[in-house]
Amino acid sequence: MKPNSHPEYVTTEVACSCGNTFTTRSTAKGGSIHVETCSACHPFYTGKQRVLDTAGRVAKFQQKYAKVQAKKGK
């Protein structure tokens, strides 16, 4: 095996945009990683799921293209 073929595996601080931080090990250089979501703020882990208003989106679509159909019918 070649010497020095594996990257250095160091302790790394992970910081989330919500303010949560934790320590893990990684090959990332610099010793710190910044993430947008983590298990403390992600809806899957917290149980706070957002409901998308799909009915409103469909109504907007139909309203938008009803105008096009009205023009074609003239």
Curated annotation (Swiss-Prot):
Record's cofactor remark: Binds 1 zinc ion per subunit.
Cofactor field: Zn(2+)
GO molecular function: metal ion binding; rRNA binding; structural constituent of ribosome
GO cellular component, one term: ribonucleoprotein complex
GO biological process: translation
Leader sequence residues: none
Superkingdom of the source species: Bacteria
InterPro entries, A to Z: Ribosomal_bL28/bL31-like_sf (IPR034704), Ribosomal_bL31 (IPR002150), Ribosomal_bL31_A (IPR027491), Ribosomal_bL31_sf (IPR042105)
Keywords annotated in UniProt: Metal-binding, Ribonucleoprotein, Ribosomal protein, RNA-binding, rRNA-binding, Zinc
Annotated positions binding Zn(2+): 16, 18, 38, 41
Gene3D superfamilies linked to this entry: Ribosomal protein L31
UniProt-listed PANTHER family: 50S RIBOSOMAL PROTEIN L31, CHLOROPLASTIC, LARGE RIBOSOMAL SUBUNIT PROTEIN BL31C
Purpose of the protein: Binds the 23S rRNA.
Family that this chain belongs to: Belongs to the bacterial ribosomal protein bL31 family. Type A subfamily.
Quaternary structure and interacting proteins, as annotated: Part of the 50S ribosomal subunit.
Protein name: Large ribosomal subunit protein bL31
Organism this protein belongs to: Salinispora tropica (strain ATCC BAA-916 / DSM 44818 / JCM 13857 / NBRC 105044 / CNB-440)
